[in-house]
Amino acid sequence: MERNTKAVIFNAIGILATVFILVSGPIVTPTVLYILIQVFGLLLIIWALIAIKVSKKHTRHALPEGYFLITKGPYEIVRHPVYAGFLLIMVSIVEIEFTFLRLVALLILCGAILMKILREEHTMTEEVHEYKEYKEKTKAIIPYLL
């Protein structure tokens, strides 16, 4: 199967899992902890997008001419802060009203995101020489762990 076809499939699976999680139960909670987790996840996403914008580069798989690796801001903490923030939000939403089906959807979403990460990192390792060193010193999604 072609790489682009795989990417479309993983994106579709991730979107379907996300939609299922969002429509299968409440997404808003009066619990302060879940609100804080969701806000933190959203702020992490915004911070990462600002870091990309400030560097005036984007993160498409086909790297633009003159691309350089972004290692400042949230990218000093994890290699994929947008995915990390999104997963924080989705985990907290599943926890609001935990069901087996929502857990399965969350695991499917995590698998789809993992496949996207592996694809992105393969491209980055091939095309950006300093990425291997960056990868060795910075965790993918969870600081100090993963």
Question: What does each model-found stretch correspond to?
Answer:
Residues 1-71, 88-146:
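Membrane-anchoring alpha-helices and their flanking helix-loop junctions
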